[in-house]
């Protein structure tokens, strides 16, 4: 019989004056575990509102029996409705990464650059697409047009190609994966990327709060908000 899943989350506003990340986790009636992380943008009021509204709408849709795509649609619609006619929320939006995990399978949907990592045997693998400019910039390194340092510090690296803003979505990533016995899943905001992938993998054996603390310990100036939701098999 397949084991169940358990999860925990932690977050910190880092070196920013406010927190724009939101997250949630729910156990559903069929035993599935739902988790979601949203990283808002659009200033204090806008970013925080967008991520909170998106998380609430997404969770509500899934709890009412909807699929992941229904959750994303409701989240996108809710962000658009909330911003309509409110100048202080103009241009607000959020990333979104959500999973449903049950037994030996994870299903996910995502928009934006918030990573979904799978950790197995100490190796970290990002399994969702990155909808920022980072993949295109990294491709220039492979073509010899930029150095790795230039790519890492490129001013457009974190520019999003897609976000949940109430507009039609042209980029959405979704998929599923069979899971081995000792894997862990990490849903994160991109603030975690202050750490290198081997550092994230090493910290994944510890509680989610320890990974957040490792990010803060790196001492990056103006550290972005960081959120980590860690899922693992219940023992």
Spans of model-derived segments:
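PP2C/PPM-type serine/threonine phosphatase catalytic domain
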Residues: 1-235
């Amino acid at each position: 019989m397949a084991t169940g899943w358990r999860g925990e989350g932690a977050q910190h506003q880092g070196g920013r004056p406010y927190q724009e990340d939101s997250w949630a986790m729910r156990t559903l009636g069929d035993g599935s575990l739902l988790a979601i992380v949203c990283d808002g943008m659009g200033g204090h009021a806008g970013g925080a509102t967008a991520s909170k509204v998106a998380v609430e709408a997404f969770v509500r849709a899934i709890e009412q029996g909807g699929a992941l795509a229904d959750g994303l649609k409701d989240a996108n619609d809710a962000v658009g409705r909330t911003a309509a006619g409110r100048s202080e929320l103009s241009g607000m939006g959020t990333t979104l990464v959500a999973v449903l995990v049950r037994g030996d399978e994870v299903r996910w949907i995502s928009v934006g650059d918030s990573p979904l990592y799978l950790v197995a045997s100490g190796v970290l693998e990002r399994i969702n697409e990155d909808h920022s400019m980072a993949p295109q910039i990294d491709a220039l390194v492979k073509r010899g047009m930029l150095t790795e340092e230039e790519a890492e510090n490129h001013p457009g690296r974190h520019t999003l190609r897609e976000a949940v803003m109430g507009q039609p979505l042209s980029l959405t990533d979704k998929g599923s994966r069979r899971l081995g016995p000792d894997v862990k899943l990490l849903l994160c905001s991109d603030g975690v990327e202050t750490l290198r992938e081997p550092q994230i993998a090493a910290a994944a054996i510890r509680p989610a709060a320890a990974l957040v603390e490792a990010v803060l310990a790196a001492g990056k100036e103006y550290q972005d908000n960081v959120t980590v939701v860690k899922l693992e098999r219940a023992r």
